[in-house]
Each structure stands twice: as structure tokens, then as C-alpha cells.
Amino acid sequence: MTAKMDALQVVARGKAEFIRTTIPELIEGHAIVQPRHVTLCGSDVWMLSHAPDTAYPFPPGTTGHEVIAEIMELGPGLEGHEVGDFVLAIAPDHRAMAERYLTPQQNLLKLPAGKTREELLMAQQLGTVLYACKQLPSVIGKTVAVVGQGTAGLWFDFVLQRLGAAKVIALDPKSNRLQLAQQYGATDIINIREADPVEQILGINDEKLVDIVVEAAGRESSINLAIELARPDSGFFLQFGVPYEPINVNYGRIFTKCLKHKSIVHANSEPGHTSTLQALDLIAAGSLNVSAVLTHRFPFEKVLEAYELHQNATDNAVKIVIDMP
């Protein structure tokens, strides 16, 4: 009889269901892991509610990709790990919202000692931010704006100030997230609901727009705001936030301002997962205290409530942890 497991599956736009599905078959060079903690991010919301119509339904296990897991079985040829080890499991296919997940050896990252599993789980997204920052021009002495202060934006604040930015200006409509931004390295904060962000930037930065702007929200309004904040001729615009759906972007402004523009995705395909390993080391060493962003926890059976909370960003939610069965 084929073994079964519980899993979530995004079956239609805005609709996910609990299902029973077949446990993956163990193959050479892979491990079967049991996800223990999963956190949600903007790309999960995109898959749930904003992917192209032709993408639905997604496969079983969708959608979860920030995962701490326990190794349950080792396939032939897999070395360096033992059954019972806890790992950060890289899940680029977003299919880890399930009781079991099949992972190749290169996507099993050992956890350093000294921090909780939930804290170390933040290394997955922090790693994507480190990877993105490696694509930026030098930020030493520069003024950088970060539009969007979810956890990705907060990690940008932290990394950019460590890289030597003279000013890190955090923008968001939520005051609780702006308070966190100050904890994580922002030199200035702007609540975009309370003041004109362009005027505020000019006031902060000697009547100049910023050298570099990072967009970390993926909304139409935030992307167009980021374009406005970048300095003409020399400004650099990094698009990190996942656009939720086809949007109207003022490309004419990118063109007439002669901006340098780069989008960044697929950090999980970085050879050796170097940036994610660096993120694990930063958290383990205490260089970054991630505990302040861990605001909510849900059991697996209430994951649909967690998605709703994440999508609406109510109750001062920042990072939501799902405790798997």
C-alpha cells in the first residue's frame, strides 16, 4: 500500500486545501525530510493569489519554501548527514508545506549551534537579501532608500548599514515596522501614509534624491515610488519585491531619469548556497537578533488563517511561523 501524508495544495486562485497525497519516493543523492517549521513570505502569497491563471492548480505541498526540517531517510550516495539531523532545507519548488519533502543533498544546510530553530529559519530570506546586495554597486558613503519594511526590507536595512551606507532610509505605511527598521539599521524612517516621501527624502538628503533604492514590497505603488526616489542619471534601482500581478509601471520615468535597473530572483540557485550559509553564520554569531520579527505562530491545521494574516498584514504581523505536525 502506498504511504500517504498530509499536505496543503493551492488548487485555484486564492484557494488552498488540505489533502492526502503520496509520500515522495526516496532516490539517490536525496533525503526525505519532515518539515518542522515553515515561515511565510511574499512569494507564497503570490503563488496563492496572484500567479497566472494557467499556473493553477499548483502541485501538492504548495506553498512553503522557508523550512527547518528533520532528516527522516537518507538515499544512496548521500553523505555528511544523519537521520535525525535538523537542517535548513532549501525548497525552490515551494512544495514543503507537507509532512514529508524530498530534498537533494546540496539543498540540506546544517544548522549551527547556539540559536533556536525558529531564529535560524530566518537565514533563508536573509540569504536572499545578502545575495541581492552582492548585485548592487558599492554602497559605501551612499544614501540608500528601502521601500517596504517586511522582513526582507528589514534585512536590507541591516545589511546595507553593515556595508557602509551613509544613510539607510526606510519607507513603509506601518509604524510598527518602521520602529523595527530603526532597530535593524535604518538611519531615517518615513511613514508614507503621513508625509510625502519625495519631500521627506529631499529634506533628509540635502535636497537630493537617493543614490540607490531597493524595492522590497512588490506592489504597484511601491515600485513606482521607488522609481521616483532614485536620483536622475546616476541612480540605481533594485527590484526585489515579487510583483503580485501584472502592474502599470512608469517605465517612462526609468527611461527619462536614465536609471540603472536590476531585478533579482532565484537566489536559491546560487552555487553552494553561499549567501544562505553566510546568513546562518550571522544569526548564530549573534550579529543579527532576528527574534523581534517573529510575531506570530500557527499550527499547520490553521495555516489558512496564517496566509490571510500575512496577506492582510494586520495585528502588527511581521514574520509568521507555521509549526508542522
Residue ranges and their predicted role:
Residues 119-194:
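Mid-domain Rossmann-like dinucleotide-binding core that forms the NAD(H)/NADP(H) cofactor-binding site
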